[in-house]
Amino acid sequence: MLFGRETSLKVADQIVGSARDAGVNFIDTANGYAGGASEKAVGKLIAKDREHWVLATKGAATIGPGPFDRGISRKALTKFLDDSLQRLNVDYIDLYYLHKDDEHRPLEETVATLGDMIRAGKIRHWGLSNFRGWRHVEAIRIADKLGVPHPAASQPYYNAMNRMPETEILPACTHHGIGVVPYSPLARGVLTGKYTPGEKPGTSSRAGRGDRRIMETEFRDESLVMAQTIKSHAESRGMTAGAFALRWVLHNTLVTSVLAGPRTMAHWKGYLSALESGFTEEDEALVNQLVPMGHPSTPGYNDPQYAILGRPVRPYA
């Protein structure tokens, strides 16, 4: 996500090289990251050994003001994919996610388009990102109806501050054989413990910039206190808070892989360190005490980018 924007190509190359040396072969980007610059950077970084990498990218997020600069229609997705292939400088993409749902649009056209992309050899598999549990099942039903392969992976926002995917998304994916690849295991940086309760965040941070998605979800004093509790516990175990948070996600047997978004080599090494420590029953109990299974860290935790649709009201008297 940060490659091509906050992370220079030189540093990104060092991170990718270190990842490859550590046995990593799965790399993820999106057409909307850094205005397309992230895809261009990833394409350059994997060009010398393309076949080593399982390459994932995403389409459907808003990238401009035009009517087909967003959404999951055939016309929009076709343009998104062709542009991604060009920026990545590849002939095919291993895993192509729908980055965002459009719950007001029937999925038949979308799934049929993805099937055509597979038959054309432009993508190998498709997946869903930020889709609700019932929409996963609907996508599978339509895929069966149209003779299209099932989605191979789901990319939910899942971490110790947001355990809501445990109620529907993760069980549904497991039941239907869909891999689960959570993003933002550090809860947009909150789980690193870098934010101090009661103190104004740094201007260069996501919270300091007033990003609505963090301000209306994790950035509340209760959550920041929880993050500090996790940080203290992790340090008593000889781990960083970030490594603990990543390890917590990976300890869930329903999780297939996890996305790391390092900005620096130090960040990347911090992610890798999560694999060096075990996870104990006491570790699990601590998080359960702070954030119960299936719940977010605080009441009213709603990502403004994904509206709650379960209460349309009748006309008032």
Predicted regions and their residues:
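N-terminal binding-site loop/beta-alpha segment at the start of enzyme catalytic domains
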Residues: 1-54, 119
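Glycine/proline-rich, positively charged
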Residues: 4, 21, 64-164, 168, ...
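Conserved, mostly hydrophobic/aromatic
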Residues: 12, 27, 42, 55, ...
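Generic structural signal for well-ordered alpha-helices
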Residues: 16, 39, 43, 81-85, ...
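A short, structured active-site edge motif that brings together acidic residues
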Residues: 52-64, 155-156
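Glycine-rich beta-alpha junction loops
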Residues: 59-61, 132, 158-162, 184-191, ...
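Aromatic-lined glycan-binding groove of carbohydrate-active enzymes
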Residues: 165-205, 240
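Terminal-tail/helix-coil boundary detector
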Residues: 203-232, 236, 254-255, 265, ...
